[in-house]
A protein has these predicted regions:
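Glycan-recognition and catalytic cores of secretory/periplasmic carbohydrate-active enzymes
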Residues: 1-184
């Protein structure tokens, strides 16, 4: 993981694209890079909701509680929603390549806790950050004069509600997310 000059969103996209490159060229190093990034992020920079980051960056490993409550950064700027979205893209791609269920377990937990909770049910607007510190309220974008990166991915999140409930292979269908649904 690079130094703090790069946002987590940039990091995530690099590893997702590396994984796409590995599918084209069969270079194991790209797959290994994506797997390592995913594992480091989940093990050392992720909150219980599945979201991660502080002020769009990774800081010291295993210090997310400090980042959320006592750091010099604004405690309301944890868990950037579009970074969470990109971790879901990476998780799905890693699952498709490896078949390892841990990626879909993370996907289900994160989609349920971080993505579904990121939309205002009354207005449809979305959140940029999801504060993990106690005492913070949710802040949603204003519908007509405020547009963040997470506004765009926020719309995309809710256009994919049924995308990963099931995965299909040649000889089976697997339930990946236990939501009320019917396979089509």
């Amino acid at each position: 993981i690079r130094d703090r000059r790069y946002t987590v969103l940039t990091e995530n996209e690099d590893y997702y694209n590396s994984l796409s490159d590995s599918e084209k060229s069969s270079l194991e190093m790209y797959l290994k890079a994506a797997e390592n990034f995913w594992q480091i992020t989940v093990d050392h920079h992720t909150y219980v909701t599945g979201g991660n980051s502080q002020s769009e960056h990774f800081h010291a490993a295993d210090k997310i509680g400090y980042d959320a409550t006592k750091s010099e950064y604004d405690a309301s700027t944890t868990c950037e929603t579009c970074n969470t979205y990109n971790m879901l893209k990476l998780s799905k791609a890693l699952y498709q390549v490896s078949g390892d269920k841990k990626y879909m377990d993370y996907f289900e937990t994160t989609y349920t806790n971080a993505i579904l909770s990121s939309q205002n049910p009354e207005t449809g607007t979305t959140m940029y950050f999801q504060p993990m510190a106690p005492g913070y309220n949710k802040v949603f974008n204003r519908p007509f004069d405020e547009f963040w990166c997470c506004t765009g991915t926020g719309m995309e999140n809710f256009s994919k509600l049924g995308d990963n409930i099931y995965t299909v292979s040649e000889d089976s269908v697997a339930v990946q997310m236990f939501y009320s649904s019917e396979p089509v």
